[in-house]
A protein has these predicted regions:
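N-terminal Rossmann-like NAD(P) cofactor-binding subdomain of oxidoreductases
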Residues: 1-90
């Protein structure tokens, strides 16, 4: 399963990542997603370094599941775009 965490660089996104790690949530691929200004930032999850990607790129990656922890406006704009490509949006 390809999992996207939208808003990964924010406070809530960081907490979601902690919960995913604590509960050993199963996934094959992880996409850390944030605003375009945060794209390119490096983050570590479970000892592996990830590069944060922007929302547009994340939609094109067609994740199976996207967990949104971004602000309301961002979620209202982008959640439907993820759903349109078949992503389950949480």
């Amino acid at each position: 399963m390809k999992l996207a965490v939208v808003g990964a660089t924010g406070l809530v996104g960081s907490e979601i990542l902690e919960v995913l790690e604590e509960h050993q949530f199963p996934f094959d691929e992880l996409l850390l997603v944030a605003s375009e200004r945060s794209a390119g930032k490096k983050m570590t999850f479970k000892g592996k370094e990830y590069t944060v990607i922007g929302l547009k790129q994340a939609v094109s990656e067609k994740p199976d599941v996207a967990i949104f922890s971004a602000g309301g406006g961002t979620s209202l704009e982008w959640a439907p775009q993820f759903a349109e490509v078949g992503t389950i949006v949480i």
